[in-house]
């Protein structure tokens, strides 16, 4: 790969020389930082198995190299990269994979290590959604995830990625993460805090990432990280697992933050060593059992991951000063719930007891049952998935519900050709040679749901959301 010029402040280089173990070469560190980052993807096992995905893309000639810490993760090389961006492939558009940097798959691998099966998980700094969607896949879309994002502009992107991947067990919030220890004390089985950081590990992706770097800013960021970790630790139930991670390399934002928590809460904090997380993990292992991944070790972004267990309860934090307000939804039960369920099943939308029906005026929603005990304690930006809007003639089923719940082998499923699927993504009506028999059509491609539509005469009326419609060259090569 070609080298690219990375800006390194002198003080940063001095700090890295001090932080790097003697077993690693500083020259190799500089060389690795100058190389462009390898592309990588994670297969979305909520929609397709790894084996089936590999068989599906075999004709494309993509070269996939397994990522050792993530069974469904692969580094990818493509000869057709310039002709067709990875994000415009049919498999990406239908949510079969997520474009995710390899090292950022590490925190979720650590969260679920040692056969850990949490039912209620918080992703405290969730956008753009790579780790939230990875958590959802590991949970099999069961239980519940509270995905929080402090940046308002990034919440929309987070929701879009969750929807594309067909995830139904998630609630979104928009808070400073420091509120959760007080607002939701000891409510979570597992918490991921992928903390905001100085981003020293991302120079392979952004050569100018260190333009505004300074030792003083590292210390300021570390102070915020300690407050976030303190909040997360209070929100974790006794016996629960917390993973703290960053994409930076200095010890102040990494080891020192975790050691501060141990010093503060002593025996309530147990560090869980990560040396057995995957083959060769010991190459990045610190004396404390953390993973401090310098970019030359595994040829990926720089990263830090620590895993710990909460051994006992803590005194409660002061109660939050905000009011949540009245919850605008009511549970849908009895005959009404049965009617909605039967109508949804008739068009191929299926769910189980993990999701419960709720209603707000004419809107019908599905909430993960595991999140319901948090209602009234925190304000949600979005909870579960919107299933339908009721009207005089029945229900208008929502796109995100179709992607998450539709059964592609249902009697109303209608498989499109590649050209027809591309027309669908462009927002155009479909004129199949042999129209479907049913009026309500579950449109699929590669046996994946693309949406619910109406057959009108010989055409299928496009229902793809306008905000998702794609322009330019897509997977058939036509513009």
Swiss-Prot record:
The keyword Methyltransferase belongs to this UniProt entry's keyword annotation: yes
One BP annotation, GO: rRNA base methylation
UniProt catalytic activity: cytidine(1407) in 16S rRNA + S-adenosyl-L-methionine = 5-methylcytidine(1407) in 16S rRNA + S-adenosyl-L-homocysteine + H(+)
InterPro entries noted in UniProt: Methyltr_RsmF_N (IPR031341), MeTrfase_RsmB-F_NOP2_cat (IPR049560), MeTrfase_RsmB-F_NOP2_dom (IPR001678), Nol1_Nop2_Fmu_2 (IPR027391), Nop2p (IPR011023), RCMT (IPR023267), rRNA_ssu_MeTfrase_F (IPR023545), RsmB/NOL1/NOP2-like_CS (IPR018314)
Localization (cell): Cytoplasm
Any single Gene Ontology cellular-component annotation: cytoplasm
Active site feature: 247
Domain of life: Bacteria
The name this protein goes by in its record: Ribosomal RNA small subunit methyltransferase F
Organism ancestry: Bacteria, Pseudomonadati, Pseudomonadota, Gammaproteobacteria, Enterobacterales
Encoding gene (name): rsmF
């Amino acid at each position: 790969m070609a080298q690219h010029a990375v800006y390194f402040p002198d003080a940063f280089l001095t700090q890295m020389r001090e932080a790097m173990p003697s077993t690693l070469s500083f020259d190799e560190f500089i060389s690795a930082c100058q190389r462009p980052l390898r592309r990588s993807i994670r297969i979305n096992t909520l929609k397709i198995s790894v084996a089936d995905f590999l068989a599906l893309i075999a004709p494309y000639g993509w070269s996939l190299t397994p990522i050792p810490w993530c069974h469904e993760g692969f580094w990818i090389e493509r000869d057709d990269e310039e002709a067709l961006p990875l994000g415009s492939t049919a498999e990406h558009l239908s949510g079969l994979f997520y474009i995710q940097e390899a090292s950022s798959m590490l925190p979720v691998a650590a969260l679920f290590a040692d056969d850990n099966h949490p039912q209620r998980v918080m992703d405290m700094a969730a956008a753009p959604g790579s780790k939230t969607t990875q958590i959802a896949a590991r949970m099999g879309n069961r239980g519940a995830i509270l995905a929080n994002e402090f940046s308002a502009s990034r919440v929309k992107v987070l929701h879009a990625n969750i929807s594309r991947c067909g995830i139904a067990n998630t609630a979104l919030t928009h808070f400073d993460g420091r509120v959760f220890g007080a607002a939701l004390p000891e409510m979570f089985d597992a918490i991921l805090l992928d903390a905001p950081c100085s981003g020293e590990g991302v120079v392979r992706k952004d050569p100018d990432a260190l333009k505004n770097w300074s030792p003083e800013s590292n210390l300021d960021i570390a102070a915020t990280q300690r407050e976030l970790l303190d909040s997360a630790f209070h929100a974790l139930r006794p016996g629960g697992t917390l993973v703290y991670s960053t994409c930076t390399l200095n010890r102040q934002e990494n080891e020192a933050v975790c050691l501060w928590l141990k010093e503060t809460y002593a025996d309530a904090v147990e560090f869980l060593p990560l040396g057995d997380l995957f083959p060769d993990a010991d190459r990045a292992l610190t004396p404390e059992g953390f993973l401090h991944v310098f970019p030359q070790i595994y040829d990926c972004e720089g990263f830090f991951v620590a895993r710990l267990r909460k051994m006992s309860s803590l005194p409660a934090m002061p109660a939050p000063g905000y009011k949540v307000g009245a919850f605008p939804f009511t549970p849908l039960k009895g005959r009404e719930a049965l009617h909605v369920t039967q109508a949804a099943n008739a068009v191929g939308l299926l769910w189980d007891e993990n999701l419960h029906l709720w209603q707000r005026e004419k809107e019908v929603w599905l909430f993960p049952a595991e999140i319901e005990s948090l209602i009234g304690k925190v304000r949600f930006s979005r909870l579960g998935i919107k299933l339908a809007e009721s009207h005089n003639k029945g229900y208008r089923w929502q796109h995100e519900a179709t992607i998450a719940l539709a059964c592609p082998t249902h009697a109303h499923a209608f498989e499109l050709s590649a050209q027809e699927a591309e027309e669908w993504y462009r927002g155009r009506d479909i004129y199949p040679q042999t129209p479907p028999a049913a009026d309500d059509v579950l449109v699929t491609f590669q046996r994946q749901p693309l949406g619910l539509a109406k057959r009108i005469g010989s055409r299928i009326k496009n229902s793809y959301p306008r905000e998702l419609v794609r322009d330019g060259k897509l997977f058939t090569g036509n513009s």
